């Protein structure tokens, strides 16, 4: 350990072990997944906390060898064992890009696009003093770089092949191979009643395919082939959202499918159910009529949905009449 700390010091990184880890130091070959909590502090007298993964409720997952935009994190986690807690003070040369990385991580934590605001700017332009990152603390750090302190707790180290990668960490080939596996896992979770988890799997599979599709010319044979793989996954995702009663999301996704494939029976049926749930009676009836036109064998199922819709409408009418009687009786 002493020689590791000495090498880090020569490179402008001071390491202080707070709690020893378990077992031997992993070899951290390319593809190893390191899961850790981090806290980032300024190194000035105030020592302000910039970011804390515990506050956000989700640890950082770093894949070794994937050229993460902040190479110093890969350097320091390579020196840690599972269960270890350590503090690293890193010279400014190692953390110049931290403001950009932190913005992306904050966007991810907030459920936003991690590339928001970065698509049309090169790295140099982003570092210009007049380019705001949308966070006052990151803007200040960008304009006046300083050494940063990282408190790291290494939670878990997983060797390549022992975990399922997140879509963003996969190569194109890995994404293509992963989609059928993720799809089947989503189906299994749905059958077992784990609807929210199934939706997350379908979402991941769609994300893989969308990423591949972005690299193809829209309307080209490869683009169409990928789109036809996306459609059944999106319909499965919509089924999960129907169960979760998130009807407007179902309306949006099914409409997007029908704008491209106007003979998709499942999209009409799911959209009809969503319309019925939000009291769009005429639109629901129109969609169910289209289902019967395209697939007469669906008649028993459609009839059941229409009867349920009519019963709900009658009940609502009776409730409205009772409410109005109450208003006018005073």
Curated annotation (Swiss-Prot):
Pfam families: PPIase_AIP. InterPro entries: AIP/AIPL1/TTC9 (IPR039663), PPIase_AIP (IPR056277), PPIase_dom_sf (IPR046357), PPIase_FKBP_dom (IPR001179), TPR-like_helical_dom_sf (IPR011990), TPR_rpt (IPR019734). TPR repeats lie at residues 179-212, 231-264, 265-298. It is found in: Cytoplasm. Keywords: Cytoplasm, Phosphoprotein, Repeat, TPR repeat. One of its GO terms (molecular function) is peptidyl-prolyl cis-trans isomerase activity. SUPFAM superfamilies: FKBP-like, TPR-like. GO terms for biological process: xenobiotic metabolic process. One of its GO terms (cellular component) is cytoplasm. The modification Phosphoserine is found at residue 43. The keyword Plastid does not apply. Residues 54-146 form the PPIase FKBP-type domain. The keyword Cytoplasm applies. Interacts with RET in the pituitary gland; this interaction prevents the formation of the AIP-survivin complex. May play a positive role in AHR-mediated (aromatic hydrocarbon receptor) signaling, possibly by influencing its receptivity for ligand and/or its nuclear targeting. This is AH receptor-interacting protein. It comes from Bos taurus.
